[in-house]
Amino acid sequence: MTTEIKKLDPDTAIDIAYDIFLEMAGENLDPAYILLFNLQFEERGGVEFVETADDWEEEIGVLIDPEEYAEVWVGLVNKQDEMDDVFAKFLISHREEDREFHVIWKK
């Protein structure tokens, strides 16, 4: 018997990712990136819910089912409203009782 996973709605996934970003950015991003993000966030900042990529295994070393995770990017958008400077990519489990997450930080 398989259990149906209640997926995170985009707004909830975005809130979770942004909270984690604010909490962990200081430990994981270069100070220059933090300064750039803070200076430009009001004008160009974005947090986007995107289609879950299927290449996370290459990044985190664990095979995942894209249907069981939400992917959210935090970064800066350009004039075409496209995120062209990604500071963190989040992979967040849809399972509320086991809300694991993975983050790829800008290097």
UniProtKB/Swiss-Prot annotation:
Domain of life: Bacteria
Any one Pfam family match given in the protein's UniProt record, by short name: DUF440
Function field: May act as a double-stranded DNA (dsDNA) mimic. Probably regulates the activity of a dsDNA-binding protein.
NCBIfam families: PRK05094.1 (NF003469)
UniProt similarity note: Belongs to the putative dsDNA mimic protein family.
HAMAP family the UniProt entry points to: Put_dsDNA_mimic (MF_00680)
Protein name per its UniProtKB record: Putative double-stranded DNA mimic protein NTHI1680
